[in-house]
Amino acid sequence: MTDADFQNWLKRGGRFVALVEVQTSPVRYLSTVAYTTLPTDTPANRVYSPVVAGGVALSESLPLDGSATRSGGDIEIHNEDGALDGWLSDVWTNRRVRVFVGDVTWPRADFRLIFDGIAAGLESRTAGRLNITIRDKLQRLNTPVSETLLGGARIMSKIRKFLP
């Protein structure tokens, strides 16, 4: 599919679907409506669970001073029956999240990537819903490189001996 074909599809409106892939263990394949990849797709016959409520909310800013800013958003998940409550005990922080858009009739390869970032976490803000907080990849710079702490009382007492 060419860029022109995709732009034409956006203008005329089709059977829109957003596909969300979250690299948790196991990988979560989510969508706004039921979608299964075609037998000729790679990977073939992958099922995306139709649990995404509405769309994907993203916000961005472009500071005039050229500084880097983090963008973020939210993906709301249907969980009215509580079937996905177990997800709350999974590790979601810093897991890759990719969001694609396309038409439900298209092969997976024709979908367009609209977001490639990370999850900042999963929580439940209201009854019957889960929320995946998403951030751009700059969020990875906001985590410790090492869990090792330098310093401490013992080391500081030795350093103080050399201070005036």
Each model region followed by its residue ranges:
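Juxtamembrane "anchor/assembly" segments of surface/extracellular structural proteins
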Residues: M1-P164
